[in-house]
Design a protein with these regions (language model features):
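Charged, amphipathic alpha-helical segments and their flanking helix caps
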Residues: 1-22, 41-141
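Short acidic low-complexity segments
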Residues: 22-31
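A short, hydrophobic beta-strand-centered structural micro-motif
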Residues: 32-40
Length: 141
């Protein structure tokens, strides 16, 4: 299972009555009481050997149901629900770091990061021989 699918599972557990979870933008717009999930950035830091530390950041945008009144109340309730219930992704054994929820233009942006260390095999050509040309420089002595 990939991380995006695990995020969708965590959102579905936290908000079972959600109408839709999008992974792509739509030209028609998003229906109310739905999520749009997208990656923000990924960083890879090389470590000793062939290990890397990877940090991935994601944004989950919640669109409230506009047919109901009290949009701000819907955003407040969803902010509390996400911060209280979406803390880890058990399917991929990752904990969410730096969780933040902020209302922006009538929607709620829930951002977080995950971090993991991996062993990455890299193609390399082992040095089988070394040919040296040259010698010691003459210092004029």
């Amino acid at each position: 299972m990939d991380i995006m699918t695990a995020i969708g599972c965590a959102l579905k557990r936290a908000v079972p009555d959600i109408k839709k979870i999008y992974r792509e933008k739509t030209e028609q717009g998003f229906v109310g009481h739905s999520f749009y999930v997208y990656p923000i950035m990924e960083r890879a830091t090389a470590e000793i050997g062939t290990y890397e530390m990877r940090r991935l950041s994601y944004c989950v945008v919640y669109f409230p149901d506009e047919s109901k009144r009290e949009i701000n109340q819907q955003l407040d309730e969803m902010r509390a629900r996400l911060l209280d219930n979406v803390t880890h992704l058990p399917e991929v054994h990752l904990r969410l770091l730096d969780r933040e929820a902020e209302p922006v233009d009538g929607a709620l942006n829930f951002t977080f990061s995950v971090r993991y260390r991996g062993l990455y095999e890299q193609e390399h050509n082992p040095m089988t021989s070394l040919t040296q040309k040259g010698g010691v420089a003459n210092n004029g002595n």
